[in-house]
């Protein structure tokens, strides 16, 4: 099979190497618009469930990712200097460029051709192939030009900026700071021994009130460094652009009624996005391409394979999309919860995946005192982009039981 992958992110690279592992005779080319060694963003976060999938699919690249990943432990919620530590949280962060390098090297070792600096504006630019896999992100040109996928895009109301810093956060940290214009907070986690991802978020009203809409980008970074001075310990905030700046954005939630048309198929952010506050983007993109590769192997006809892939992945996305929507809404309504005591606020932050939160007064959502019948159902199974509730001991890849969260 001749395959063109548009986009050299984790989804495109992993799909290509999986196809080569299944059938070395496949002719697979990745077209990546950026130069080799350049990427957007800083690092990505993930948990054992993704690492288990990687080990099951390709142990060699999984070991490299495992070895390169930064392991953070615990979760810290810091509201104006008052901290609540959740000791049941742990996960992984990895430098995005390091992740791409591992996957690109593995794909090329297997015979995949990667063409950098090759922007594909429309499928008609591509050579004649049997399958075009659109892994070109939320702004997918392939999705726009290839057919009617019935795409829907919803713009979140909060503003956010994706930054990096030399401060290494050993725990996944949510610092909340109050300003005269409202609350500003961050999602911070280590990605290697020298740096962390630091995503800043606030309401549009706070963003405008603080002047981010008019001040030069470098002045904006300086203001953020001042606001988070206590958490950064003197370290700078750095943007993704060569000049060190980065754009403020509104998150775009993308859904598609159809994931394929003819020989064109969507995967990763081109097919769907889930709000960054649940930290599932990379996991879901990898899940897409694992399913796509499996269906292409198991079905003799392309249309049957793509139909089965679409059905499986749309069903798999229902729960994380719901959790992401609720998580985004929780942060968009931060004023509803922020005046609670820090431990109460932290409890609801970790339980924000509950559909009850928007509809009941916050005090009714909190766990009942001991002896009063146990905890409220809204907080029995915390779900967040940084934590989940502790479960029973389960076997790991090494065969040693440990708690998952």
Regions found by a protein language model. Name each.
Residues 105, 118, 128-251:
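Conserved FAD-binding catalytic core of PHBH/FMO-like flavoproteins
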Residues 11, 36, 139:
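Conserved Rossmann-like nucleotide-cofactor binding loop
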Residues 5-21, 133-134, 247-326, 330:
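Conserved mid-domain beta->alpha element of the FAD-binding
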Residues 48-162, 367-383, 403-404:
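Conserved N-terminal helical subregion
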Residues 1-3:
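Extreme N-terminal starter segment of soluble prokaryotic enzymes
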Residues 6, 21, 62, 67, ...:
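C-terminal helical "tail/cap" subdomain of flavin- and related membrane-associated enzymes
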Residues 35-53:
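Conserved N-terminal glycine-rich FAD pyrophosphate-binding loop of Rossmann-like flavoproteins
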Residues 20-41:
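Glycine-rich FAD pyrophosphate-binding loop
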């Amino acid at each position: 099979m001749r395959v063109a992958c548009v986009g050299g992110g984790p989804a495109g690279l992993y799909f290509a190497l999986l196809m080569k592992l299944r059938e070395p005779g496949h002719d697979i080319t990745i077209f990546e618009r950026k130069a080799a060694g350049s990427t957007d963003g800083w690092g990505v976060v993930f948990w054992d469930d993704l690492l288990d999938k990687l080990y099951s699919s390709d142990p060699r690249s999984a070991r490299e990712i495992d070895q390169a990943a930064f392991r953070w432990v615990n979760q810290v919620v810091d509201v104006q200097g008052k901290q609540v530590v959740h000791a049941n949280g742990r996960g992984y962060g990895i430098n995005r460029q390091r992740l791409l390098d591992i996957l690109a090297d593995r794909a090329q070792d297997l015979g995949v051709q990667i063409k950098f600096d090759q922007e594909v504006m429309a499928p008609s630019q591509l050579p004649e192939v049997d399958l075009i896999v659109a892994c070109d992100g939320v702004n997918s040109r392939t999705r726009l030009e290839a057919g009617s996928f019935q795409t829907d895009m919803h713009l979140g109301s909060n503003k956010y900026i994706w930054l990096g810093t030399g401060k290494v956060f050993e725990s996944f940290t949510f610092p909340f700071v109050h300003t005269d214009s409202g609350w500003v907070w961050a999602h911070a986690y280590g990605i290697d021994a020298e740096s962390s991802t630091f995503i800043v978020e606030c309401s549009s009203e706070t963003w405008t009130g603080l002047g981010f809409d008019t001040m030069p980008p470098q002045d904006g970074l300086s203001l953020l460094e001042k606001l988070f001075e206590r958490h950064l310990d003197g370290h700078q905030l750095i943007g993704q652009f060569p000049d060190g700046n980065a754009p403020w954005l509104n998150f775009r939630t993308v859904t598609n009624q159809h994931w394929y048309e003819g020989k064109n198929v969507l995967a990763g952010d081109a097919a769907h996005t889930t709000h960054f506050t649940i930290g599932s983007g990379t996991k879901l993109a990898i899940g897409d391409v694992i399913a796509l590769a499996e269906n292409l192997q198991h079905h003799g006809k392309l249309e049957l394979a793509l139909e089965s892939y679409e059905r499986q992945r749309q069903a798999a996305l229902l729960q994380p999309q719901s959790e992401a929507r609720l998580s985004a809404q929780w942060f968009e309504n931060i004023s509803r919860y922020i005046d609670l005591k820090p431990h109460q606020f932290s409890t609801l932050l970790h339980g924000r995946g509950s559909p009850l939160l928007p509809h009941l007064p916050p005090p009714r959502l909190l766990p009942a005192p001991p002896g009063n019948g146990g905890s409220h159902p809204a907080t029995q199974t915390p779900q967040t982009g940084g934590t989940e509730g502790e479960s029973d001991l389960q076997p790991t890849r090494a065969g040693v039981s440990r708690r998952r969260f």
